[in-house]
Swiss-Prot record:
GO terms for biological process: Mo-molybdopterin cofactor biosynthetic process. The keyword Cytoplasm applies. One of its GO terms (molecular function) is sulfur carrier activity. The keyword Cytoplasm applies. Keywords: Cytoplasm, Molybdenum cofactor biosynthesis. Its main location: cytoplasm. It is found in: Cytoplasm. This is Sulfur carrier protein FdhD. Required for formate dehydrogenase (FDH) activity. Acts as a sulfur carrier protein that transfers sulfur from IscS to the molybdenum cofactor prior to its insertion into FDH. It comes from Streptomyces coelicolor (strain ATCC BAA-471 / A3(2) / M145). The active site is at C115 (cysteine persulfide intermediate).
Length: 282
């Protein structure tokens, strides 16, 4: 628990000079997520906020949607031969009456730090019905100026990145640009799960007046996680994938990419971005 960084000795070469020095690395360890005692998924993550990560993952799977859906989450002892607790296995127990989607029951997958969708049988299988449809969320409007300010604020909040240079991050902002929460992880999808899981634990779902900002690209999976949490605006500092754009268009999600300086691309849901000039075709 809390094993966020590790120190390792490295050989540094700079301007032809060679030296040996310690370096701080981001920790990466497997986390097995069990659902009601049954193995469900393994993800490579940065230790910390494991319960929130597991809860957020299950929100994106359509298992959890409200705080009352969750009974408890515990670390599992006995995961090793000597029976010790490695803090790398968690068991999520749902509240009585919570229906587990068939797709979740059929899954037993390995997800990497960058792709949580590895192991999905098909694209159609992950188009789960959201409990909080984006189209039903209250009207949210953000300005390009507000969006342009968010990446620098996210970067300023990345404390572990400052020590390692090796972490992704995700942040929740209000529609007025107030920073609500920031999570870091070796995987973008884990960082988002930690945000969403914490919101579920605090009974803050749906996040219907929120803007989600992610470092790096916006994949289909990240768009799905935003939709399942009821987040109306997803912004990324890099490019979205074609499937992310398709999902955003289908669900009404506002998707912004290449958010750098005062420049950005709006790929879907432009009605939530307060544009002052008419959009031309070029």
């Amino acid at each position: 628990m809390g094993r966020v960084t590790e120190r390792r000795k490295v050989i540094r070469i700079r301007d032809g000079a060679v030296s040996t020095r310690p370096d701080t690395l981001v920790a990466e360890e497997p986390l097995e997520i069990r659902l009601n005692g049954k193995p469900l998924a393994i993800t490579m993550r940065t230790p910390g906020d494991d319960f929130a990560l597991a809860a957020g993952f299950l929100v994106s799977e359509g298992v959890l949607a409200e705080q009352r859906d969750l009974q408890n989450i515990v670390y599992c002892a006995g995961a090793t031969v000597d029976g010790s607790n490695t803090y790398n296995v968690v068991d999520v127990k749902t509240a009585p009456g919570v229906r587990i989607p068939d797709i979740t029951l059929e899954r037993n997958v390995y997800t990497t730090s960058s792709c949580g969708l590895c192991g999905k049988a098909s694209l159609d299988a992950v188009r789960t019905t959201a409990r909080w449809p984006i189209a039903d969320t209250p009207p949210v409007r953000v300005t390009p100026e507000l969006l342009a300010d968010l990446p620098d604020r996210l970067r300023a909040s990345q404390r572990v990145f400052d020590r390692t240079g090796g972490l992704h991050a995700a942040a929740l902002f209000t529609e007025d640009g107030e920073l609500v929460d920031v999570r870091e992880d070796v995987g973008r999808h884990n960082a988002v799960d930690k945000l969403v899981g914490r919101a579920l634990q605090n009974a803050d779902l749906p996040l219907s007046r929120s803007v989600l900002l992610v470092s790096g690209r916006a994949s289909f999976e990240l768009a799905q996680k935003a939709v399942m949490a009821g987040i109306p605006v997803l912004a990324a500092v890099s490019a979205p994938s074609s499937l992310a754009v398709d999902l955003a268009a289908e669900t009404g999600l506002t998707l912004v990419g290449f958010l750098r300086g005062s420049s950005m691309n709006v790929y879907a849901g432009a009605d939530r971005v307060a544009l002052r000039a008419a959009v031309g075709q070029g």
